Structures are given as C-alpha cells and as structure tokens.
C-alpha cells in the first residue's frame, strides 16, 4: 500500500510540473504576440507620419495684404449681413460668416484662393479651407490694430513724451491727433469724441479698463479712443462708424451720419447715456458714481425770484421782485454762456466789424451777483464746486419766429491760467485750499458757416493742445495741421474744454 501511495504522489508531481511548463510557455507566447502587435502599430504610425505632409505655420501668410485691412467698420458679413461669428479675410479685407464647410468664408477661400482669416471676436487666426489655427508672431501687429492695449507706463508717457509714428504708407502722424472720417454729416460727432479723448482721467479710464461685460456703447467708445491713441496704426486716420451705429440705435436715429446736429446737444445726450451705461447713478457733491461725473460734473446754486407787476389807474406799471427767494443746487456737466446781442444800428463803417467780448465777461452770469430775467423770473447763478474739467458752451444760435439767427461775436480768452475763483463760492475755495481755481485751455471747437448756392452750411472743427510739446493741432475730419497759438482766438468758439492746472 505504501508503494502505491508513493507512485501516486510521484505521478501528481510530474503532472503539476507539466502544467507549470505549459502555463509559462503560454504566457511567453501571449507576451510575444503583444510585442509583435505593438511593433506593427508603431511601424504603421511611422509610415503614416512619413506619408502625411507637415503643414507649416507660415503657409499663406505671405498673401496677407495689410494695406487693404480696415477694422474700423462694423463687423458684419458682406454676404449674409449677420454679425455672428464673423471672420475677416486678411487678403482682401472683407468680412464673412463662419469657417465651416458650408460657410461664406469657406466658399470665399475656395473661389478666391484667399486662405488667411481672423475671428473678429477672439482674434484667433485660421487658414481655410483646411480650417487649422495659426499661431505666429508675425500676426501680432494685426491683432494689436484690431484691439489696441496699453500699459500704465505707456499711458503715463502719453502726455510727457513726444511721439511721432508712421503708418504703412510711411506717412507720419502724432498719436491722439489723427483725422476722423466724415462718412456723411457726422462732423458734429467727430469733434465731440476728439474732445473727450483728450480728457486725461476719462481717456486713461477707457485705455486701461476691461469692458468685455459692458454695454456695446462703452465697448465701442473704448475701442475708438484706443485707436485714436494707437502708435502702431496701419493708417493715419480712424473711422467712427461702429460707434455711430450704436449711437444711432440708442438715440432712436436722432443722432446719425445722415443729418448734422448741434454738437452741444449731442454732447449732453452722449455723456448722460454713457453715465447710465457705466452703471452711474445720481451723484452727490461728495461722491461721483462714474468717470463722467468725476471728470465734468459740478454744482451750481440757482436763486429764483418771481417778478410781480403793480399798477394803479393812470399810473405807470411797476415791476417788483417777490420777497420769497427759492434756492436750489443743481448739477451740471457743462455751462452755457450767453453772448451779448449784436448792435441793432450800424453805420457804413461799422457794418463789417465783428464785435468782441472777453470770456470772463460772459462768465459773470455765474458770479452770484449778476441777474437774469426771463419768463417772469429773476435768477442768479453761482458755482458751488469746481470740477477737474469745465466745458463751456458759447451760445451762438437764437431761434425766433422766422429763422435761426447766428451771433458772430468773437470771444477772447487766455490760453493758460484762467482764474475761475470770481465765479466759485468762497466756501468751496476755503474748504479745499489745495485745489487750484486756475484752468488751462485743452480743446476749442470752432463753428464755421459757409454759403453755397444761397444755402448756408455749418462746419465744425476742433483745435487741441498737445501737452507733451505744447503745440496746437487743428483737426477737421481727415485734415490735421499744426497751427499757431495765435490762431486759437480768431474763430467762432462754440465749445471749450478747460483743465484744472496742477
């Protein structure tokens, strides 16, 4: 029995050894198959890599024509007129929708052999019809022209370091003092935007902040101001078409390129609308709620007194002021200055003489002593605060029952250190001894009347000081020229911008 057990144990041991050998061989065979599969896959990938051409990042970039690129106009597809997913062709400058196989940009690439496009929203560059993205430093200048950006150091240098730049045609221009396209009748619009673009805190705010989540009016104004101050521009002028389109929509077509308007009316509407778009609310003297109110808003005290008439039978009518005087403090963004009426009688020698008046004389309206009588009320005005910037509107047009009469009186003024203290309340001056009451002229909007074929046309141009060189430039639409400071006082000043001296 013991011999049989030993034989059975030996037999089991041999069977287990045979099984272990079979399992090892099986694992080796499986591992070998896996290695062969991996080798085959790698060989196939190498073959595919060798047969597939490598697409260069610089392919088609030499077809880009920067002289035809104009990103100032509204980003709308030239075929479907939609403003969604718009791409700009960098060969011809036209706008097309999408980049998929059924898009207008795709068909344009096939039919016109134009291959390089940029997404107008993301500023990413693509090659069509292959539809792959291109990342090249050679395209950064195009992205910068589409959406200029500024650093704090660059903004600080704008008013202290003289700059002279050149466009693609090697035409020199001074950033900030470039022409603005008059599409039809929008010169009233151009001069107002130019003036606002030279208000330092206002300008710096729109150069440095991010407005991606703001209303379109704010975004388009920021882009336009940045393009005005762009020192890497492709051309030495800009077009306000995108901003005007938004203004036309918000104003219900009251302000557009089709009809010329009063610049001061547009300025008032634009500042108030912009204040609301920036989230501003009704401000107090101590706390402005937007950059608009911070830069321009002041407060004026108005004392109103009713005028009563007394008369007895057979006696002359006598007008006396009511004993009750109502006092209100109201905010303002600009001050209206009334010109003295033109002389009624003129002899043959005085007929061609244009009257003159000093700026401080027409500002006496706000000295708190001068009275103004209108519509049965006697009023006195006195400035309660002095904002960083004063905007003066010199009222030149008076409407009567028959026509609008223009007052050609020339206003004379100093260019620097104009003292506003006689018109500001003493309490403000005493409580703010460090705030200067002297102001320097920054911009002067001129009105010009031209008669053609018995019809009168009104033109507006602006004269702006360059603080880095103290030179003056006159801008009328696309025409920019350097002028002498003596020329500033010779025109019919319509709107003036004064900056508090530091």
UniProtKB/Swiss-Prot annotation:
One annotated GO molecular function: cysteine-type deubiquitinase activity
Cross-referenced Gene3D superfamilies: Cysteine proteinases, Zinc/RING finger domain, C3HC4 (zinc finger)
Pfam family for this entry, one: UCH
USP domain span: 178-501
Superkingdom of the organism of origin: Eukaryota
Family of this protein: Belongs to the peptidase C19 family.
Protein name: Probable mRNA-splicing protein ubp10
Gene that specifies this protein: ubp10
């Amino acid at each position: 029995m013991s011999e049989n057990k030993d034989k059975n144990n030996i037999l089991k041991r041999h069977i287990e050894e045979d099984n272990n050998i079979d399992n090892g061989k099986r694992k080796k065979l499986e591992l070998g198959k896996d290695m062969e599969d991996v080798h085959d896959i790698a060989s196939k990938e190498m073959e595919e890599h060798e047969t597939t051409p490598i697409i260069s990042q610089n392919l088609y970039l030499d077809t880009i024509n920067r002289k035809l690129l104009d990103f100032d106009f509204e980003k709308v597809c030239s075929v479907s007129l939609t403003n969604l997913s718009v791409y700009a062709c960098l060969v011809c400058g036209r706008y097309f929708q999408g980049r998929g196989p059924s898009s207008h940009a795709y068909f344009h690439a096939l039919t016109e052999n134009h291959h390089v496009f940029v997404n107008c929203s993301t500023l990413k560059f693509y090659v069509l019809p292959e539809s792959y993205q291109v990342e090249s430093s050679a395209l950064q200048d195009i992205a910068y022209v589409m959406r200029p950006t500024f650093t704090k150091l660059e903004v600080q240098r704008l008013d202290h370091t003289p700059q002279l730049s050149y466009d693609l045609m090697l035409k020199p221009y001074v950033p900030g003092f470039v022409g603005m396209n008059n599409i039809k009748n929008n010169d009233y619009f151009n001069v107002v935007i130019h003036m606002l673009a030279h208000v330092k805190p206002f300008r710096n705010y729109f150069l440095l902040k991010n407005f991606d989540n703001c209303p379109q009016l704010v975004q388009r104004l920021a882009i336009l101001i940045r393009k005005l101050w762009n020192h890497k521009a492709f051309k030495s002028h800009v077009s306000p078409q995108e901003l005007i389109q938004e203004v036309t929509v918000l104003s219900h077509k009251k302000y557009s390129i089709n009809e010329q308007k009063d610049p001061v009316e547009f300025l008032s509407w634009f500042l108030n609308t912009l204040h609301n778009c920036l989230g501003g609310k009704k401000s107090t003297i101590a706390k402005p709620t937007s950059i608009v109110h911070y830069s321009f808003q002041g407060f004026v005290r108005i004392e109103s007194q009713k005028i009563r008439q007394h008369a007895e039978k057979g006696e002359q009518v006598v007008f006396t002021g009511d004993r009750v005087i109502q006092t209100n403090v109201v905010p303002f963004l600009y001050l209206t200055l009334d010109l003295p009426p033109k002389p009624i009688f003129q002899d043959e020698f005085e007929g061609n003489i244009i009257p003159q008046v000093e700026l401080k004389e027409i500002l006496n309206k706000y000295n708190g002593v001068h009275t103004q009588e209108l519509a049965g009320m006697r009023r006195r005005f006195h400035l309660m605060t002095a904002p960083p910037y004063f905007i003066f509107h010199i009222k030149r047009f008076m409407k009567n029952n028959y026509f609008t009469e223009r007052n050609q009186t020339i206003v004379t003024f100093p260019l620097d250190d104009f003292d506003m203290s006689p018109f500001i309340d003493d309490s403000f001056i005493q409580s703010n001894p460090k705030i200067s009451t002297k102001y320097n002229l920054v911009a002067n909007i001129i009105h010009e009347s031209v008669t053609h074929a018995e019809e009168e046309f009104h033109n507006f141009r602006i004269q702006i000081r360059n603080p880095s060189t103290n030179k003056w430039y006159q801008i009328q639409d696309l025409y920019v020229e350097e002028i002498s400071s003596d020329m500033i006082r010779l025109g019919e000043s319509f709107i003036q911008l004064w900056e508090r001296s530091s």
